[in-house]
């Protein structure tokens, strides 16, 4: 993984209120919420070691990578061909209509194996308020909850999570035709 990939190696997903940058190797390395000009939650784009990130990628990332959007959408598809197989990571942020559009923002990430068998790894390391605010982790079998001053985030989905300090990680092996989704929600 390139510690500081060029902006050209990123895709943009958003929900009309804020946006996230997704590197071509499956790392969300910039996300601010609840608005574009809010303090960051993930900022590895600026500080790889301390800025925080959300990784969903094959365990062995060697190979060819390409990003594209589903036609006429803001749904980003990151495709890869590796020695283990061919897979995709699909990223998007659902749009919430109405007056509560800024109350909750979701990063939806789907890992899918097209051919072969691929082990996907996940690492969620939020660093709230430009990494200036400490957070506390509550981990249950259903979800991980990150508590920071003035912010709460939840991570849940089809990939089993385990504690890694105040962060979480996980992994899941997918065979051809299988998919697993995770959702990061800012409240």
Residue map of PLM features:
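Beta-sandwich/jelly-roll carbohydrate-recognition scaffolds of carbohydrate-active enzymes
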Residues: 3-187
């Amino acid at each position: 993984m390139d510690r500081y990939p060029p902006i050209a190696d990123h895709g943009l997903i958003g929900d009309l209120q804020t946006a996230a940058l997704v590197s071509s190797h499956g790392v969300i390395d910039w996300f601010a919420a609840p608005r574009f000009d809010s303090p960051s939650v993930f900022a590895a784009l600026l500080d790889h070691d301390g800025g925080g990130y959300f990784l969903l990628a094959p365990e062995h990332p060697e190979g060819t990578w390409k990003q594209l959007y589903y036609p006429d959408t803001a749904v980003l598809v990151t495709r890869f061909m590796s020695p283990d197989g061919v897979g995709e990571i699909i990223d998007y942020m659902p749009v919430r209509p109405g007056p509560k559009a800024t109350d909750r923002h979701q990063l939806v990430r789907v890992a899918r194996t097209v051919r072969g068998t691929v082990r996907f790894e996940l690492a969620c390391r939020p660093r709230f308020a430009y990494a200036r605010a400490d957070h506390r982790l509550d981990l249950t079998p259903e979800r991980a909850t990150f508590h920071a001053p003035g912010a709460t985030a939840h991570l849940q989905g089809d990939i089993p999570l385990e504690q890694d300090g105040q962060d979480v990680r996980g992994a899941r092996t997918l065979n051809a035709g299988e998919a697993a989704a995770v959702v990061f929600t800012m409240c």
